Amino acid sequence: MSEKIKLIGIGDDGFEGLSKKVQSIILDAEIIIGGLRHLSMLPEVVAKKISWSKDLKQDIKKINEYKSKKICILASGDPLFYGIGRLLLEHYSISEVEVIPSPSSLSLCCARIGYNIKDIEVVSLHGREFDDIIKYIQPNNRIFVLSHDKSTPSRIIELLNTLRFEDSNLYIFENIGGENETITKKRVNEPVNEKFSDLNSILIECISNKDSIYYPNFTGIADKEFENDGQITKSEIRAITISQLEPMEKSILWDIGGGSGSISIEWSKIHKNTTISIVEKNKKRIQFI
């Protein structure tokens, strides 16, 4: 490419929230690519505007068609924080892309309430399985949730009540960084009457009690905690087995003849970013897993 692709992070304060230098890059562009919401934030521009389709990977490949042009891609906040940046850099090297970030939603939210980013775990539910969050719900944990849509806060409140984490605190951030920014702080056990914006993020302060339900993050969980028909690796053997397997971040486990799934279930609790494939032919045992 003759010029680098400019990958520009834009906040909820839109074009006006960008520096003059970044504004001039956008105004000078010949091709501007982004979501409809981001494109609508721009003033009149001479560039051809292209909105993402449902097939992002194909759209990114097509960028090559404009390689002789000055290209800007608009993304939310920090494009490398659960954004389009990762996917773009799978197809183009960093020598072909200049990343110009704005503050991430996490940075803005932590700044509003004075929390240290390093003390917080991040979970994205955007286009992912909602149940992915369950493994993060632990006593004294702080979790930042990138919501899927306006229903996410209510679903999280329902889940926390079900898991008996009803004393936990929530911060619900809507339209963070924009004119319509709002921050709602509430206890999980308080009534929910709010209608939330699609653009929301949530910070959970997990507060447990003696009745709280959560996945232990240690090995040797009691056998009675697993549904089984007697085909189960006993607690003490399970603890030794898993320690010998030495699970690490991004490890892959194949469990052949899963039985109750106890080995795999415990393995998954040690690190959150692991992959497990279980092979089990007994239909009844599949239901246990």
Question: Where are the predicted features?
Answer:
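A contiguous loop/helix-start segment that scaffolds small-molecule binding in enzyme catalytic cores
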Residues: 2-7, 20-23, 69-71, 142-230
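Conserved SAM-binding loop of SAM-dependent methyltransferases across substrates and taxa
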Residues: 260-272
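Conserved alpha-helix/loop element of class I SAM-dependent methyltransferases that forms part
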Residues: 232-249
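Phosphate-coordination loops involved in phosphoryl transfer and adenosine-cofactor binding
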Residues: 2, 68, 140, 250, ...
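Short, glycine-/small-residue-rich phosphate/pyrophosphate-handling segment
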Residues: 105, 110-141, 148
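Class I S-adenosyl-L-methionine
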Residues: 1-100, 107, 130, 276, ...
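Conserved class I S-adenosyl-L-methionine
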Residues: 250-259
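Short alpha-helix immediately C-terminal to the canonical SAM-binding loop
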Residues: 285-287
